Amino acid sequence: PNAITIVRILMAPIFLWMLLADGGSDGALRWWAAVIFIVAIATDGIDGYLARKYEIVTDLGKLLDPIADKVLTGFAFIGLSILGELPWWITIVVLIREVGITVYRFIVVSDHVLAAAWMGKLKTVAQAVALSLALLPLWDLVGEWIFWVNGVTMTIAVVLTIASGIDYVVTEVRAARARRAAASPTRDA
């Protein structure tokens, strides 16, 4: 499973190059970029499933898996913003949250592994759906209403991104307080 995660990380720059190579037009490279993104993000569930099924869940996997998601989605947000298809403020808000949580994961890794929480997983699914819709050049096939659908899915993804970031912070503050309370000697009155 860790090998799958590493391949997902390595697919990210290939995806970004294909997305940007022809200026983001609706040609073959855009379609291939979208397919690579969708396959790479979809394998997120596969590596986790295999790790649990064969009982080979590792701390490295818990650390690398969310990083693979962040690299893939981060490249997609950046690429869409470079192409002018997504406002930069959305990309910046998402990247601040993603980089912040990732840096925190590395800071606390010697103390404990900050595994993905349910809201973080929901956020990743919402981002994957919104980004997949934004990456697929469907406007020629189904019409301009796809932009409205993508706006709704992107809004949901951004709200969940912010909410899950807040959830991680609140959870970690509570856990830190509990660890301090457990480590400090009790006082008898």
Task: Locate each region found by the language model.
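Alpha-helical transmembrane bundles and membrane-interface segments of multipass inner-membrane proteins
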Residues: P1-A189
